[in-house]
Amino acid sequence: MQDLSAKQQYNNNKLQKRLRRHIGQAIADFNMIEEGDRVMVCLSGGKDSFAMLDILRNLQASAPINFDIVAVNLDQKQPGFPPEVLPQYLDSIGVEYKIVEEDTYSIVKEKIPEGKTTCSLCSRLRRGILYRTASELGATKIALGHHRDDILETLMLNMFYAGKLKAMPPKLVSDDGKHVVIRPLAYCHEKDLIRYAEWKEFPIIPCNLCGSQENLQRKAMKEMLNEWDRRFPGRIETMFNAIQNITPSHLMDHKLFDFKSINSSSGVIDGGDIAFDKPDIPAVPQLMVIEPDDRVEIIELN
């Protein structure tokens, strides 16, 4: 690992502490990992899954519960995939692991026309293999490396293209109904994961070896959110807070709230209607932040 100045080391320690806190909080908030769990960490070779594995192992050493970790990588036989990189890294850190070799690349190439995105079919094939592997390994949880930015991008994609108010759940039952899938990075910022991967010098494997065209809609959402973050600091955090602070009675989904039964004797619900009032909305985002000395305070972002 690179030689670091005292200031760099201080900043890196703060970064690691922040990621530990975010992952630990997500685990606690959604009861992601329990006593005796065997957590299968899906390792793609990208920055996010490397960071997830590293921090989970770090937390494992000090957690008040006992749980096991097994890292799993799916070698899909994509051209140029370096099969030696992940085993060498995983051997060096002493973690239990399994490399699953399945030629899904040939299947995808056969089914998808040249130039079209292969991600959807590839993901379905990959999920099935990972579910099977989890059963073979006796894993009780499957950990995926999606972070806060992925969740917000998915929220915007569903709003703009599918007409749904839907993002990525932090915890769910797998498609086959046999496993619990968790996303420990749900509270983590992508920019923190990028910095962490650079510091730790993870042996990153490119994600475009398959030659698939990038998902243009998701790329557009990412660029839009990044632009908002640059122009309006704090807005992205506020958006993320919003999906954790939902008032069904003030939306329009009658499956979530029984609007039909409301009558004059129902009383005021969730603050009533503010259509005729001045909106009680702050001019700038107000966020809870953790200062370096771990004191919590409200700050206003200009």
UniProtKB/Swiss-Prot annotation:
BP GO terms, sorted: tRNA thio-modification
Co-factor note (free text): Binds 1 [4Fe-4S] cluster per subunit. The cluster is chelated by three Cys residues, the fourth Fe has a free coordination site that may bind a sulfur atom transferred from the persulfide of IscS.
Keyword Iron-sulfur: yes
The protein's annotated pathway: tRNA modification
The protein's required cofactors: Mg(2+); [4Fe-4S] cluster
Catalytic activity: cytidine(32) in tRNA + S-sulfanyl-L-cysteinyl-[cysteine desulfurase] + AH2 + ATP = 2-thiocytidine(32) in tRNA + L-cysteinyl-[cysteine desulfurase] + A + AMP + diphosphate + H(+)
EC id: 2.8.1.-
Residues spanned by motif PP-loop motif: 44-49
Keywords: 4Fe-4S, ATP-binding, Cytoplasm, Iron, Iron-sulfur, Magnesium, Metal-binding, Nucleotide-binding, RNA-binding, Transferase, tRNA processing, tRNA-binding
Main function: Catalyzes the ATP-dependent 2-thiolation of cytidine in position 32 of tRNA, to form 2-thiocytidine (s(2)C32). The sulfur atoms are provided by the cysteine/cysteine desulfurase (IscS) system.
Protein name from the UniProt record: tRNA-cytidine(32) 2-sulfurtransferase
Organism lineage string: Bacteria, Pseudomonadati, Pseudomonadota, Gammaproteobacteria, Aeromonadales
